[in-house]
A protein has these predicted regions:
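Short aromatic/hydrophobic "clamp" motif used to bind/position activated sugar donors
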Residues: 10
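Donor-binding/catalytic cores of nucleotide-activated saccharide
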Residues: 18-158
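C-terminal subregions of glycosyltransferases and related glycan-biosynthesis enzymes
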Residues: 133-209
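Short, conserved alpha-helix that lines the donor NDP-sugar binding/gating region
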Residues: 1-6
Length: 209
């Protein structure tokens, strides 16, 4: 999709989610007003029993320049010290300037088919010069359904996560202006725990296969 896109901005919506009708209008207007590389919003989590939860990030609202990105975002760009994702994880909450992505050759790795946001967003966060956060604008609707690819066991997941970490090392090991080495270690700890947690939910018969 990124290769054939011709629009000025690019957004992503998962097939089992939906958005507010004015989501991209609000984000587009913010992108034009503040002249940023991307705009990010908040989301509403909708569970299978139809209960809704508004989810926001523990970072400031508004405009982020390179200095503020370095001070507020870089410390958890890949993975936080609490062994959890950083604030820029989900591409579905963002509207990206296409020229920014193409100028920096930012795309998705074909062999990272799960949690691909983590790799993509980490590189975006490092490369961008500015972004704008529409805090408390719950414009994206994320449906948390049992059995989706984000909640079910996936055979071969560990190999995919190792490949993702390899790509992250290839990029961030070359960087000299900030030390991401601890985050790269925590990244592997997180995904090791993720795979062990998923495997522990399998029946004995499934685990043998």
């Amino acid at each position: 999709g990124l290769k054939i896109a011709t629009g000025e901005y690019i957004g992503f919506v998962d097939s089992d989610d939906d958005i507010e009708t004015d989501m991209y209008e609000k984000m587009y207007n913010a992108a034009l007003k503040y002249k940023v590389d991307f705009v990010m919003c908040d989301y509403q989590r909708i569970n299978s029993n139809r209960t809704n939860f508004n989810k926001t990030l523990d970072i400031d609202s508004g405009f982020y320049d390179k200095e503020k990105i370095r001070s507020d975002i870089f410390p958890a760009l890949i993975m936080g010290s609490n062994i959890d994702y950083g604030p820029l994880l989900s591409v579905c909450l963002c509207l990206y300037k296409r020229q920014f992505l193409t100028d920096n050759s930012i795309t998705f790795a074909n062999d990272v088919k799960w949690s691909e946001d983590n790799l993509f967003s980490a590189i975006v966060g490092y490369k961008c010069n500015s972004f704008y956060y529409l805090k408390t604008e719950y414009l994206y609707h994320y449906y948390s359904n049992p059995g989706t690819i984000t909640t079910s066991y996936r055979a071969g997941a560990w190999n995919v996560y190792c490949k993702m970490n390899e790509y992250l090392h290839n990029f961030f090991d070359q960087i000299s202006d900030y030390d991401f080495s601890e985050q790269l270690k925590i990244h592997m700890i997180y995904y090791a725990c993720n795979c062990l947690g998923m495997a522990s939910k399998l029946s004995e018969e499934d685990a043998l296969h």
